[in-house]
Amino acid sequence: MTPHINAPAGAFADVVLMPGDPLRAKYIAETFLENAEQVTNVRNMFGYTGTYKGRRISIMGHGMGIPSCSIYAKELITEYGVKKIIRVGSCGAVRADVKLRDIVIGSGACTDSKVNRIRFRDNDFAAIADFEMTLAAYQVAKQKNISVQVGNLFSADLFYTPDVAMFDVMEKYGILGVEMEAAGIYVVAAEYGVKSLAICTVSDHIRSGEKLSAEDRQLTFNEMIEIALESVLIGDQT
């Protein structure tokens, strides 16, 4: 057990899907897993373990922002032996060609956070996803005829940013989605020698003002979850 996870040793599978919202973790476990059992509930950050098509998989919320997700990712890796983490969450779009409900596979993640520089002795670390996990997710999407875009996310420290001009810079550099965690998870995974990936569904469009309801964010995004789960099965074959 840790200060943030009250699960016994062996409670988590080697692969964990991590949404930010603990209620989305509950929804994923109850909707997609067989024989799902809650294994942790500290601070109402729920974690579950069950099976998907016979494959043992866990679901664990990670909260909002790089500090929160870094704590949970680190403890899952070092205390519970997790080898692969897939963030499944929401993001905002800035580009006109990225629409509401589009799915983004984050091959890399930029950030304005200082956290990764602290880890990497004040140098920039290229926060990238594992290639095989990225490829597996892309292959699943193509097999299921689900439209996805692959490229850079931007992990922001501020949800309500005063620097709106930065959105123009993001668009210029081809950022597909703005969220708050991927860059942190990628670097925690790199630090401890495990694999990670972030798959996000566009819940807001920063330019147009379109957005999904809180209920939609919690209970939908099924295609993203299917891509993540099926990609685990493909990964087992490589």
From Swiss-Prot:
One Gene Ontology CC term in the entry: cytosol
Gene3D superfamilies membership: Nucleoside phosphorylase domain
Protein keywords: Glycosyltransferase, Transferase
Enzyme class: transferase
PROSITE patterns the UniProt entry points to: PNP_UDP_1
GO molecular function, one term: purine-nucleoside phosphorylase activity
Active site (record annotation): D204
Pfam families in alphabetical order: PNP_UDP_1
EC id: 2.4.2.1
Oligomeric form and interacting partners: Homohexamer; trimer of homodimers.
Function noted in UniProt: Catalyzes the reversible phosphorolytic breakdown of the N-glycosidic bond in the beta-(deoxy)ribonucleoside molecules, with the formation of the corresponding free purine bases and pentose-1-phosphate.
Similarity section: Belongs to the PNP/UDP phosphorylase family.
Protein name, UniProt field: Purine nucleoside phosphorylase DeoD-type
